[in-house]
């Protein structure tokens, strides 16, 4: 089954109900939300989410397991300085996700800044173990990154090493096509790309795909998303991810730029699903 959706707006007054309504208007059967501003840890109380309205009207069209939650960008679980704040926040975030009944929380692995990469890697593994010990049900998904600055997890071997070191069924990977392209993985050579995903065992942990084109050339380490078919990856390669059996049943989530201050996810979803 093809599962496809986009980042949708989780905002007052309708929050979850409004977000899933927007997804359905885009002809999607999956969705991704932030539970607050992406650059902030501010959160409203779960009783404001309009959960019952969602359950009454949209539960069957987009069930909770196909609602992906993304953690805010500002947390850094790989930092020995910021890990405690990040971990405490993520524990509370997972409690809110449990309230919704969603299954996956995507998070950026973090940066190594004033400390070594090895220190950051050990801290990240420790953080993930601590969060999982204090929570239930939700699966944490580390996102593949572009390698900008001192980002963690810009290559498949590293992200798989970290996931396997956590030793939990509640840890997995979210692959972002723009990020891995910018990190140097050539999606245009699709057979080789799939071979690399298998070789590194990343496929064993892959639970969600962020499907984005890239404004930047291969290996640029820029992390600049483009609309589908308007970047260097191209429509043909991204469409292969939709239809290839290797990625069947994995939710594909678009995070592409607005056009004229409006999302065009409905157009992009239709474009991707069109068989040529």
Swiss-Prot record:
Which cofactor names does the annotation list?
Answer: Zn(2+)
- The superkingdom listed in its UniProt entry is Bacteria
Q: Which residues bind Zn(2+) 1?
A: 70, 108, 143
- The coding gene here is nfo
A GO molecular function annotation here is:
zinc ion binding
> Under what name is this protein listed?
Probable endonuclease 4
Q: Which NCBIfam families match?
A: nfo, PRK01060.1-1
Q: Give the record's family classification.
A: Belongs to the AP endonuclease 2 family.
């Amino acid at each position: 089954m093809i599962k496809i959706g986009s980042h949708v707006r989780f905002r007052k007054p309708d929050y979850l109900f409004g977000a899933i309504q927007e997804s359905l208007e885009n002809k999607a059967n999956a969705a991704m939300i932030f539970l607050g501003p992406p650059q902030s840890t501010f959160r409203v109380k779960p009783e404001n989410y309009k959960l019952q309205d969602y359950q009454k009207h949209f539960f069957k069209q987009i069930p909770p397991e196909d609602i992906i939650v993304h953690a805010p960008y500002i947390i850094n679980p790989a930092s020995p300085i910021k890990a405690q704040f990040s971990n405490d926040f993520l524990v509370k975030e997972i409690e809110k996700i449990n309230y919704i009944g969603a299954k996956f929380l995507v998070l950026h692995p973090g940066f190594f800044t004033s400390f070594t990469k090895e220190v950051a890697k050990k801290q990240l593994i420790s953080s993930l173990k601590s969060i999982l010990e204090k929570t239930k049900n939700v699966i944490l998904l580390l996102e593949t990154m572009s390698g900008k600055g001192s980002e963690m997890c810009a290559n498949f071997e590293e992200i798989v090493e970290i996931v396997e070191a956590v030793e939990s069924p509640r840890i997995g990977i979210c692959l972002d096509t723009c990020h891995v392209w910018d990190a140097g993985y050539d999606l245009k050579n699709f057979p080789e790309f799939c071979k690399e995903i298998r070789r590194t065992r990343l496929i064993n942990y892959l639970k969600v795909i962020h499907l984005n084109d890239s404004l930047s050339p291969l290996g640029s380490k820029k992390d600049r998303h483009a609309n589908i078919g308007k970047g260097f990856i191209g429509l043909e390669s991204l469409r292969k991810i939709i239809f290839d059996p290797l990625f069947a049943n994995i939710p594909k989530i678009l995070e592409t730029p607005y056009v004229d201050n409006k999302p065009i996810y409905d157009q992009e979803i239709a474009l991707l699903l069109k068989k040529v």
